[in-house]
From Swiss-Prot:
The keyword Oxidoreductase applies. CDD domains: NAD_bind_1_malic_enz. GO terms for cellular component: cytosol. GO terms for molecular function: malate dehydrogenase (decarboxylating) (NAD+) activity; metal ion binding; NAD binding; oxaloacetate decarboxylase activity. It comes from Shewanella baltica (strain OS195). Homotetramer. Pfam families: malic (PF00390), Malic_M (PF03949). The gene is maeA. InterPro entries: Aminoacid_DH-like_N_sf, Malic_enzyme_CS, Malic_N_dom, Malic_N_dom_sf, Malic_NAD-bd, Malic_OxRdtase, NAD(P)-bd_dom_sf, NAD_malic_enz_proteobac. This is NAD-dependent malic enzyme. SUPFAM superfamilies: Aminoacid dehydrogenase-like, N-terminal domain (SSF53223), NAD(P)-binding Rossmann-fold domains (SSF51735). Its EC number is 1.1.1.38.
Length: 562
């Protein structure tokens, strides 16, 4: 029987039910439920359906004049009635996703302490490092299957937001549910409060976190270790997603734990998976293969290098050598093109640095080889921006790229919109509508010479909910590179432009449930093939995906005792 049709037995009654967001129905409690649970008089007389409630809530949502107020309003619904919240978001996914997540969530993080209203998730502060087990036991969610955790040091492109970074795990888990069908009862946002180096927060009397410079070194590593061990003891089968850790910590944490626990880093691996999926779709639309592309990156941090490594892996899977693939990828950061003779390159950058011998025939470049120098000499067919600095994809650079590439693939992926390397409008006008464009944040369609171009949002929300659903449905013990590659290929298979030759590069958000299920199956199937879970047939895996997919419907309630 469908869980939504099965009654839920509750051992308590009265106002406590109305204060529990996972079970509160508000005005939708039936007459029988109002009597048996002592709710008569606590809600208005009319008994409403969830659609009637959602209609009222949508009218209220539309009455707000700015996105931050809309975000606060939706968060208030989430904190009082989660089923209604997810029905409302599901009904209006394209309109509300930019409100509950990027770009609005960035502003919500900056103003987290000022706008704080009600607790959600767990804050684990360094002074409480010896009581992590107790803190986990205090969680209102007892059967946790997915955790999103941050330390708030690198929130989107906004930098150190301290505990204000909690807005990101809350938002990400909202998308796990609204896009991937993960029951909100199984999700837990966590912020690791290890201090902040943001002077504005340290001096702000309203700041609610630990007022202390960030810890680092061994202290930080030991704190992360204690947290990971405690989570594994409390919820041994939980998927942990690392979110918005600083570059200096993100990759080391991932490398330390990816083979010990079921975990992944969305900024590195999720971003890479959706970028590769989008590139595969763009290549198919352009009638070419990824291993034939020459790719230039602006931004050589952990996210950019993570995407580059995923691209190299996909190129190798298409038949070229690892060495050849790396010659086709150029990484540019603030110091110019990464070269193998540069000092102080980070370990994950060293593998992607170009050999000096590869550029000995280049001409007309400066001491620090700029992106324009790379475009003029390497003649890339793909340009990816993950710099977090607006405006760096200049008209000169885009026109130079278009001069040697009829259909350039250009992905300015930096978030939020204020940090984008170039707007889709500019890119499409500079290329006479020929560029294949995807962005990290949402943009309105662009009209060039009377033709309308829908802008694909190369957003991780197309990937991580499906990965989470696939891990839960299959029971995978780890998230392997092959599972991530499978998610990229599955996303590309859903591209309207690649399938039909028209429409957007990526599916519409209204189709996100079907996309997430398709990705979940691909991810789960690889987990089974790699022996990361118990053997199961394709049919059983598909049934498990459907069985784990939660829908925002009210359940009937029964009393367990009087």
């Amino acid at each position: 029987m469908d869980d939504n049709k099965r009654p839920l037995y509750l051992p308590f009654a009265g106002p406590a039910i109305l204060e529990a967001p996972l079970i509160n129905k508000g005005s939708a409690f039936s007459e029988e439920e109002r009597i048996f649970f002592n709710l008569e008089g606590l809600v208005p007389y009319a008994i409403e359906t969830i659609e009637e409630q959602a209609s009222r809530a949508y009218d209220q949502f539309r009455s707000f004049n700015n996105d931050l107020d809309k975000h606060i309003y939706l968060r208030n619904i989430q904190d009082t009635n989660e089923t209604l919240f997810y029905r409302l978001v599901q009904n209006n996914i394209s309109e509300m996703m930019p409100i509950i997540y990027t770009p609005t969530v960035g502003l919500a993080c900056e103003r987290f302490s000022k706008n704080y209203r009600r607790n959600r998730g767990l804050f684990i502060s360094y002074p409480n490092k010896d009581r992590i087990d107790d803190i986990l036991n205090n969680s209102t969610r007892q059967k946790v299957k997915i955790i999103v955790v941050t330390d708030g040091e690198r929130i989107l492109g906004l930098g150190d937001q301290g505990i204000g970074g909690m807005g990101i795990p809350i938002g990400k888990l909202s998308l796990y549910t609204s896009c991937g069908g993960i029951s909100p009862a199984y999700t837990l946002p966590i912020t690791l409060d290890v201090g902040t180096d943001n002077p504005q927060l340290l001096e702000d009397p309203m700041y609610m976190g630990w007022r202390h410079p960030r810890i680092g070194g061994e202290e930080y590593a030991e704190f992360i270790e204690a947290f990971m061990q405690a989570v594994h003891v409390r919820w041994p089968d939980t998927l942990i997603q690392f979110e918005d850790f600083a570059q200096k910590n993100a990759m080391p944490i991932l490398e330390r734990y990816k083979d010990r626990y079921c975990c992944f880093n969305d900024d590195i691996q999720g971003t890479a998976a959706v970028a590769v999926g989008s590139l595969l779709a763009a290549c198919k639309a352009a009638g070419t293969e990824l291993n034939q592309q020459r790719i230039a990156f602006l931004g050589a941090g952990s996210a950019g290098c993570g995407i580059a490594e995923a691209i190299v892996a996909q190129m190798v899977s298409e038949g070229i050598s690892d060495e050849q693939a790396r010659t086709q990828v150029c990484m540019v950061d603030r110091w110019g093109l990464l070269l193998d003779n540069m000092p102080n390159l980070l370990p994950f950058q060293q593998k992607l640095a170009q050999k000096c011998t590869n550029i000995q025939n280049w001409s007309n470049f400066s001491d620090n080889i700029s992106l324009l120098d790379v475009v003029n000499n390497a003649k890339p067919t793909v340009l990816i921006g993950v710099s977090g600095v607006p405006g760096l994809f200049t008209e000169e650079i885009i026109r130079a790229m278009h001069s040697h590439c009829a259909r350039p693939i250009i992905f300015p992926l930096s978030n939020p919109t204020s940090r984008v390397e170039a707007t889709p409008k500019d890119i499409l006008h500079w290329t006479s509508g020929q560029a294949l464009v995807a962005t990290g944040s949402p943009f309105e369609p662009v009209v060039v010479d009377g033709e309308t171009y829908e802008i694909a949002q190369c957003n991780n929300s197309f990937i991580f909910p499906g990965i989470g659903l696939g891990v839960l449905a299959s029971g995978a013990r780890h998230v392997s590179d092959a599972m991530l590659m499978a998610s990229s290929r599955a996303l590309a298979e859903c591209s309207p432009l690649a399938i039909d030759g028209s429409g957007p590069l990526l599916p519409k958000l209204e189709d996100i449930h079907a996309v997430s299920k398709h990705i979940a199956f691909a991810v789960g199937k690889v987990a089974v093939e790699q022996g990361l879970t118990l053997p199961m047939s394709d049919e059983i895996l598909q049934q498990s995906i459907e069985g784990n997919f939660w829908s925002p419907e009210y359940r009937r309630y029964k009393r367990t005792s009087f």
